[in-house]
């Protein structure tokens, strides 16, 4: 888990000195998976949208450290939640980013035209590092409970990897999981407002 988190942080910080390769990328719009009945536990997320997710089954272990919450399941996969920080999207010290806008730019929901060269190059390097340019990963965009959600799907060490970006007012909830497609689809389907 720490290795995966460290790798993700490297990706989100951008690759220093990475070539600014053209990477025209756009998230595909996706249908929200159908909700299933019942929840073993509810994960309530702080923020303007008062969002919550049904965990479907109780985790074997629940770990909380600072702003990070990790649920580990008996099958060996995990679900982690934290709020995305501006420096993870390339903000300089003291700079305040509009995080939802940065996520939309990264995943192609907004055009890169007209951005300063340095910002466009940073976004292209992040897309490259995430595997979006060479199609090692894919992104789908959902609208669930009035919330814009981006789902990055790829693999790490031969196992499925998913990252969910939930745009909630000025903040972005970041969830990642090594669970199956079905597990993540159940999470998406259960997203609602309290």
Language model region names:
Residues 19-84, 88-92, 156-160, 168-194:
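N-terminal targeting sequences that direct proteins away from the cytosol to non-cytosolic compartments
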Residues 1-8:
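Bacterial N-terminal signal peptides that target proteins for export
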Residues 5, 17-18, 128:
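Disulfide-bonded cysteine motifs in exported proteins
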Residues 65-161, 165-167:
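Conserved polar/disulfide-associated segments of primarily extracytoplasmic proteins
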Residues 8-16:
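Bacterial N-terminal signal peptides
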Residues 14, 26-29, 137:
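Extracellular/secretory pathway and lumenal proteins
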